[in-house]
Design a protein with these regions (language model features):
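Nucleotide-sugar-dependent glycosyltransferase catalytic core
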Residues: 2-33, 70-74
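Residue-level "edge-of-site" marker
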Residues: 6, 54, 100
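Short, solvent-exposed segments of well-ordered alpha helices
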Residues: 21-25, 53, 115
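C-terminal, non-catalytic tails of nucleotide-sugar-dependent glycosyltransferases
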Residues: 31-53, 89-97
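Secondary-structure edge/capping motif, primarily at the C-terminal ends of alpha-helices
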Residues: 41-45, 68-73
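Short, charged, amphipathic alpha-helical segments
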Residues: 50-56, 80-81
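Amphipathic alpha-helical repeat scaffolds of TPR domains
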Residues: 53-68
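Membrane-interface aromatic/basic loop that binds lipid-linked glycans or pyrophosphate carriers
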Residues: 71-138
Length: 138
């Protein structure tokens, strides 16, 4: 469900892992966090019950989102491959997760470009969106 109204505000701090260009730290923090969640579900015997959801959690938090951030900062970073390898090691069929079909239109396009390693097109799309936002005052 998508709503246009703002339901919460959050504070984005300088140096947080969500905006850090220190990809080594970002990789370590994200993979450690995901490992802890996966371990919790495994210990509780819930990892197979929630397999699709956990697989999507890995896709979103340890592959798709960090890869988009890395592409915009350093398309040649080794961490693009490291995040991909980590995620596919956890869930080899991750790219066929049923929840991926529920991505927004923009993210479906970015996902298709990321899978094909068309990083320059991803950067161009981001730059065009920034220009549009400046022109329209968004």
């Amino acid at each position: 469900v998508y709503k246009k109204e703002v339901l919460y505000y959050y504070l984005s701090r300088e140096g947080s892992i969500t905006h850090s260009s220190d990809f080594s730290r970002n990789y370590d923090d994200r993979t450690r966090s995901v490992d802890e969640v996966l371990e919790f579900f495994h210990e509780k015997g819930l990892d197979q019950i929630y397999r699709d959801e956990l697989e999507y959690l890995v896709f979103e938090n340890a592959y798709f989102v960090p890869s988009k951030e890395i592409v915009l900062n350093d398309r040649k970073s080794i961490y693009l491959d490291k995040f991909r390898e980590y995620s596919l090691e956890k869930y080899p069929d991750l790219e066929n997760n049923r929840y991926i079909s529920e991505l927004s239109g923009k993210d479906k396009i970015l996902w298709a470009l990321l899978r094909r390693k068309m990083y320059a097109v991803m950067v161009l799309m981001s730059q065009l969106r920034q220009i549009r936002d400046r022109v329209t005052g968004r």
